[in-house]
Amino acid sequence: MPLFFYRKPALVVYVTCGDPDIATTRAIVLSAIEAGADVVELGVPFSDPVADGPVIQRASERALKQGTSLSQVLTLAADVRQQAQSTGLVVFSYLNPILRMGIEKFCKVARHAGVDGVLVTDLPVEEADEYLRAMHAHDLAPIFLAAPTSPDERLRRIAQASRGFVYAVSRTGVTGARQKLAGDAEQLVRRLRRVTKLPVAVGFGISNAEQFAEVGTFADAAVVGSAIVETIERNRGREAEAVGEFVAKLTATSCQPSV
């Protein structure tokens, strides 16, 4: 599974699938990849996105009005995989859509589509045994969120359950671009380094090239989500072009090969 980071910092981008529609999402994803995204998180829209801030909430509402479903997201993943063989593809979802499809069926279809990993934002590692068995059976990488408030023993458990990379949440609260990174992020990465050799990606709040470069001084990758979704929201009619331009500005600061 190509969930490797070939430079430092690597760039993980998040998009809400179906905003403004699936066809445009495809163009956005391919534009981001062409501009230098290393991993793409394909966000499944959900009616109650409690972990997300207003930008992604609005995107989910727009996508749901288009009728976007988990099945459509997996079809999109298969299409993108045909065009981008070496880019990591991660499905980013709440648990409910996966349960509605069925965990086993979801994992089978996702693997067939060329998905590499899955992040279920509201599934605690302590309750993930059935999910993990299915993920491992279908050679998918389970990715879990690690928060600054997590005690060391829980970080260890999260790291042991994760494959591909560990997602370090830079701060508590919901998603959303911020002008300044939280000070907890670097400390959390140091704590994770003590319990895992997996790459660590930092997300929640990264919105510009300066923050992206800052994360690269202590983490393996940076996740940019709300800033991407906001770029889409502000550039109706030229979404793919605008995202490509934004990603290119970020990746221009990332030229150091990962070792």
Which residues are covered by each model-predicted region?
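Glycine-enriched alpha-helix->loop->beta-strand junction motifs that scaffold or abut catalytic
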Residues: 36, 110-116, 134-143, 160-166, ...
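Alpha/beta catalytic cores of nucleotide-metabolism and tRNA/nucleoside-modifying enzymes
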Residues: 190-198, 207-259
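Hydrophobic faces of well-ordered beta-strands that scaffold small-molecule active sites
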Residues: 11-15, 40-42, 89-93, 118-120, ...
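Active-site-adjacent beta->alpha loops and helix N-cap segments on the catalytic face
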Residues: 1-5, 22, 47-58, 65-78, ...
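Conserved, mostly hydrophobic/aromatic
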Residues: 13, 32, 40-43, 110, ...
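N-terminal small/glycine-rich loop or linker at the start of catalytic domains
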Residues: 2-20, 53-59, 80-92
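Glycine-rich phosphate-binding active-site loops on the catalytic face of alpha/beta enzymes
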Residues: 37-47, 113, 117-119, 124, ...
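Catalytic cores of alpha/beta
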Residues: 22-33, 150-159, 202, 206-222
